[in-house]
Amino acid sequence: MEENLKIPNHVAIILDGNGRWAKAKGMPRNYGHMQGAKTVEVICEEAYRMGIQYLTVYAFSTENWNRPQDEVDALMKLLRNYMKTCLKTAEKNRMCVRVLGDKTRLDEDIRTRIAELEEATKNNDGLHFQIAINYGGRDEIVRAVKKLSAKVQSGEVDPAGITADTLEGYLDTAGIPDPDLLIRTCSEQRLSNFLLWQLAYTEFYISPVPWPDFTKEELVKAVEAYNHRDRRYGLVKDE
């Protein structure tokens, strides 16, 4: 790793390639998802070691319900088990865990486990770890607008005073800084409805590596690439 690296405060990752990775090995897609969950644990620990303050991963999108039912069922089972594993990792690395997305469609037992995990880790002062489950960027914005509209109707919010900051307070990510770096694995170059509001000035890094093979070294490569970017935020800098 290069010396004197500037570490991004917030890294977001689109975990892509689990199914293709498994297929290439002659295994079912569910095997890829299981290995991908293990990779999440490894990257959480490395992010904490590197000094990354916030890590957000895209685990299950609002569109993923359209996958074959057996795959959805397997993902929900994996999610149930992961909640237990995540709590152990959180205790080890002082992680504060927060789940983004519309939880209302999730089974009650999963919602309960999520609530228990968030409550148990809310005061931890290490890595802030966000997991996007049943999450879609458009859906998040719509839900935020509905909540804000209710406040306007009740007279609690003056519509004339609404700003971008006002709406941000109703997003799933309220209180969390926007990502500095977005990593997408397996060579895909699209957002897939992830953090559409928050990625306005985020730097992108596309990794050719499928998520189950994404290692600590790959995370370091992404951060090194980030260090060579010139972030202008819409401004023109003197040459």
What are these regions (language model features)?
Residues M1-E239:
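Flexible, compositionally biased loop and terminal segments
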